[in-house]
Design a protein with these regions (language model features):
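Perimembrane loop-to-helix junctions flanking transmembrane segments
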Residues: 39-53
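Membrane-interfacial loop-to-transmembrane alpha-helix junctions, especially the N-terminal start
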Residues: 85-94
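Core segments of transmembrane alpha-helices
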Residues: 63-74, 97-100
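Non-cytosolic membrane-interface motifs at loop->transmembrane helix junctions
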Residues: 110-123, 144-145
Length: 168
């Protein structure tokens, strides 16, 4: 019965863990719009791209789901012993991929550096793969929660590549 009791501290830590990637992700989009002086949805619509590309309203839905899953996974890992080298190592890769995620939107939309953003997303794939491996050593559930994110990154890499190659 005690395992069902959740402390206020744990609830607060959970909420913060979920909010961090959401705030980082959407603030990156906001900064991109300030830099480009254009709504990212409009910018996406204006790009030359094949007809099989998803409509712009899909991206905020997918990213919100992915950010929530990222946050939950970070919570699961960080609630373990934070003094543990395995936990610190895993969280290093978590925050590294969040940083790369943050700059990708700015590069792609804000600065319109499509090739540079393609390189960044390629690096993200490697970092997220390492993060998942590190998470597995701490909490397998946390690792599994990021498999959809990794799959989406491969798809995003493909989209980024096609947009770069058609619009250069």
């Amino acid at each position: 019965m005690n395992s069902l009791i959740i402390s206020t501290k744990d609830i607060k830590k959970f909420i913060i863990s979920v909010l961090i990637p959401i705030v980082i992700g959407f603030s990156s989009n906001f900064i991109s719009e300030i830099i480009s002086k254009t709504d990212t949805n409009f910018q996406y619509l204006e790009l030359i791209k094949p007809g099989f590309f998803p409509p712009p309203y899909i991206f905020p839905i997918i990213w919100t789901i992915l950010y929530i899953l990222m946050g939950i996974s970070a919570y699961l890992v960080s609630k373990k012993d934070l003094n543990s080298l395995k936990v610190r190592d895993a969280m290093f890769y978590y925050y590294l991929q969040l940083g790369l995620n943050f700059i990708w939107s700015i590069l792609f939309f804000g600065l319109e550096l499509r090739l540079t953003s393609l390189v960044v997303i390629g690096i993200m794939i490697v970092v997220v793969t390492v993060m998942i491996i590190k998470f597995t050593k701490v909490d397998k559930r946390a690792a599994y929660l990021n498999l959809l994110y990794l799959a989406w990154l491969f798809y995003a890499f493909f989209l980024n590549y096609v947009i770069w190659s058609i619009n250069r």
